[in-house]
Amino acid sequence: MRILEKAPAKINLSLDVTRKRPDGYHEVEMIMTTIDLADRIELTELAEDEVRVSSHNRFVPDDQRNLAYQAAKLIKDRYNVKKGVSIMITKVIPVAAGLAGGSSDAAATLRGLNRLWNLNLSAETLAELGAEIGSDVSFCVYGGTALATGRGEKIKHISTPPHCWVILAKPTIGVSTAEVYRALKLDGIEHPDVQGMIEAIEEKSFQKMCSRLGNVLESVTLDMHPEVAMIKNQMKRFGADAVLMSGSGPTVFGLVQYESKVQRIYNGLRGFCDQVYAVRMIGEQNALD
């Protein structure tokens, strides 16, 4: 038997860090939403009691470093499943980009194995399993648009944002999320208006949503990688309505209300960056049945 799952990317419309916890994690408040850029996860049941991961992308690990592998092992061991699975990952989301590609692959694996092995687990249970794998996996189980708190595992769903285009540009650099969080100084930083972003989304106001964009990690990554600032500036220059770095970076996204501007911005950025995407903000939850 074979199961197919989409694993959509996410962007952070608002990302705040409120404190560092004793366990080394940080308390966050984030507004995340899914976009129309997705990996494809193909799950095939194996008679052998093992987990295999493969991908055409050479940057995708095929062992326990892969979050989809971890997801399969976790659900298999937790529910004493004696069958195996082959996980084929067709990558569309850029790797190590701040778009939760690995987390979304893990979440899609949890959803898919729940169906493949007829486990009948609730979305809440899958999200709890996801939290054991990574901070973004719980959100990615559901998708849609949500306020994430705690270390990112506490999810409260909110309305779908106003429809718009999202231009993504990823420079050819790698950013360590752990390094960015270590370098973050909570004293004296400007915190984004998370509640204001929720209100803008509830009101379906594109202009207010643009004005409330914020990410406390952005200044840290920009100090480490000036290339990110350059892409932000170019995206603004070519006409994006609002621009922000997603997650810990290095991907920058621009919100664009009118389709007539999209091609110009996309073409302009292609001169500065190899990985450029023009997609829609979807913000709708994944099918979980």
UniProtKB/Swiss-Prot annotation:
Function field: Catalyzes the phosphorylation of the position 2 hydroxy group of 4-diphosphocytidyl-2C-methyl-D-erythritol.
Molecular function per GO: 4-(cytidine 5'-diphospho)-2-C-methyl-D-erythritol kinase activity; ATP binding
List of catalytic residues: 10, 136
Top-level lineage group: Bacteria
Question: What's the protein here called?
Answer: 4-diphosphocytidyl-2-C-methyl-D-erythritol kinase
Note the NCBIfam families from the entry: ispE, PRK14608.1
> What biological processes does GO assign it?
isopentenyl diphosphate biosynthetic process, methylerythritol 4-phosphate pathway; terpenoid biosynthetic process
Q: Where does ATP bind?
A: 94-104
PANTHER family annotated for this entry? 4-DIPHOSPHOCYTIDYL-2-C-METHYL-D-ERYTHRITOL KINASE, CHLOROPLASTIC (PTHR43527:SF2)
Which pathway, metabolic or otherwise, does it act in?
A: Isoprenoid biosynthesis; isopentenyl diphosphate biosynthesis via DXP pathway; isopentenyl diphosphate from 1-deoxy-D-xylulose 5-phosphate: step 3/6
Keywords assigned by UniProt, alphabetized: ATP-binding, Isoprene biosynthesis, Kinase, Nucleotide-binding, Transferase
Gene3D superfamilies recorded for this chain? 3.30.230.10, GHMP kinase, C-terminal domain (3.30.70.890)
Electron transport recorded as keyword: no
Q: What class of enzyme is it?
A: transferase
Q: InterPro entries this protein is in?
A: GHMP_kinase_C_dom, GHMP_kinase_C_sf, GHMP_kinase_N_dom, IspE, Ribosomal_Su5_D2-typ_SF, Ribsml_uS5_D2-typ_fold_subgr
The catalysed reaction is:
4-CDP-2-C-methyl-D-erythritol + ATP = 4-CDP-2-C-methyl-D-erythritol 2-phosphate + ADP + H(+)
Task: Give the protein family.
Answer: Belongs to the GHMP kinase family. IspE subfamily.
EC number(s) given by UniProt: 2.7.1.148
Query: Which residues are in coiled coils?
Result: none
